[in-house]
């Protein structure tokens, strides 16, 4: 991939959700909502502060994040559907321990 976000933008790949509910019901593609969880693939250098200095971003490449349903702009890079969004669209970073509990 040859894409580098600018300023406070980040590049995100959606993380697909389970195809079955906990009760074993299979969810058809037509009933699925787009996931609001993703993995950060690239980050910009940061936003400029009032004094002109660059404020580094809190998110890093590899972070698993939650974002709003309508956040970001959908793009296609190398045939893969990705999102570009501002860091302010991110609601939070999923910590490793929390992600393990969700998966279990």
UniProtKB/Swiss-Prot annotation:
Supply the Pfam families for this chain: Cpn10
What InterPro entries does the annotation carry? Chaperonin_GroES, Chaperonin_GroES_sf, Chaprnonin_Cpn10_CS, GroES-like_sf
Q: Name one GO molecular function term.
A: protein-folding chaperone binding
Its cellular-component GO annotations read:
cytoplasm
Report if keyword Chaperone is assigned.
Answer: yes
Q: Where in the cell is it found?
A: Cytoplasm
Q: What induces it?
A: By heat shock.
Grouped into one coarse class, the protein's main location is cytoplasm
Which domain of life, per UniProt? Bacteria
Assembly information from the UniProt record? Heptamer of 7 subunits arranged in a ring. Interacts with the chaperonin GroEL.
The protein's job, in short, is:
Together with the chaperonin GroEL, plays an essential role in assisting protein folding. The GroEL-GroES system forms a nano-cage that allows encapsulation of the non-native substrate proteins and provides a physical environment optimized to promote and accelerate protein folding. GroES binds to the apical surface of the GroEL ring, thereby capping the opening of the GroEL channel.
Name listed for the protein in its UniProt record: Co-chaperonin GroES 5
Q: Which organism is it from?
A: Rhizobium meliloti (strain 1021)
- The gene it comes from is groES5
